[in-house]
């Protein structure tokens, strides 16, 4: 008798479960892999402290963040952030009351600010490899780096507004010709001055070198109103601009 009652109850339970499952299907639950989530959060945190200059200096991206950085650089995230920074810079530029003496300056860095070296870094694992200056120089000498579209737009806007544009780059003076050609082919024209590292600048940190060049601008009577760069060393130091705009770059760090 007990066996019969048990079988009846079991049959009813199964039937009810099947009915409920048919009428009210259970939601499909996808369990996000815990390790993948942990790694992504770790890499997001790493990029945050990098972009806020709280992790310095560093030589390569963490190995576990290689896929994360790649997806960020080639996906929509990088472009959206570049666009946002450039849009904010453009709004600021339009708000400035320029003097009548032609002494208001906007400084642009070149690499990862006006020109993109993403084709090079895609072949070098997006910053996972230790920087090789010989290989990078070969890339520079090709003169094929494309423009960052939003930076080109900002560049043209500040020129139209009446700013004098200075290009201040860590590239060597021996790369002047190819840099000029690359910039012009990418759509950049009419800058006031292109400043590259001379023989006396080798061995200096980027912060020191760029500070010295900005000091010279100020001594000549220029007002540094805006500055755009992908490295904190483009922006910090002495004779800083009234406002600086940091473009994202999780692939490498320059002191």
From Swiss-Prot:
Matching InterPro entries: Acid_phosphat_B-like, Acid_phosphatase_pln, APS1/VSP, HAD-like_sf, HAD_sf
MF annotations from Gene Ontology: acid phosphatase activity
Disulphide-bridged cysteine pairs: none
Top-level taxon: Eukaryota
Residues annotated as glycosylated: 142
Residues spanning the signal sequence: 1-15
Record field: catalytic activity: a phosphate monoester + H2O = an alcohol + phosphate
Keyword terms: Glycoprotein, Hydrolase, Signal
Family to which this protein belongs: Belongs to the APS1/VSP family.
Listed name of the protein: Acid phosphatase 1
Species the sequence originates in: Solanum lycopersicum
């Amino acid at each position: 008798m007990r066996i019969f009652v048990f079988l009846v109850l079991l049959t009813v339970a199964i039937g009810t479960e099947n009915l409920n499952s048919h009428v009210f299907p259970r939601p499909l639950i996808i369990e996000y892999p815990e390790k993948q989530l942990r790694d992504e959060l770790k890499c997001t945190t790493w990029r945050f402290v990098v972009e806020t200059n709280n992790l310095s200096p560093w030589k390569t991206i963490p190995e576990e963040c290689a896929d994360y950085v790649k997806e960020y650089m080639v996906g929509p995230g990088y472009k959206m952030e570049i666009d946002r920074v450039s849009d904010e810079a453009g709004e600021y530029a339009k708000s400035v009351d320029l003097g009548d003496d032609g002494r208001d300056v906007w400084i642009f860095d070149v690499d990862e600010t006006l020109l993109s070296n993403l084709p090079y870094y895609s072949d070098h694992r997006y910053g996972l490899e230790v920087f090789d200056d010989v290989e990078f120089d070969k890339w520079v000498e090709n003169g094929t780096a494309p423009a960052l579209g939003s930076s080109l737009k900002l560049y043209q806007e500040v020129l139209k507004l009446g700013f004098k544009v200075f290009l201040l780059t860590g590239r060597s003076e021996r790369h002047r010709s190819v840099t000029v050609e690359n910039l012009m082919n990418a759509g950049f024209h009419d800058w006031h001055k292109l400043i590259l590292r001379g023989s006396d600048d080798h061995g200096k940190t980027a912060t020191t070198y760029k500070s010295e060049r900005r000091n010279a601008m100020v001594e000549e009577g220029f007002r540094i109103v805006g500055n755009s760069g992908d490295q904190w060393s483009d922006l910090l130091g002495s004779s800083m601009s009234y406002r600086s705009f940091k473009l994202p770059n999780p692939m490498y760090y320059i002191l």
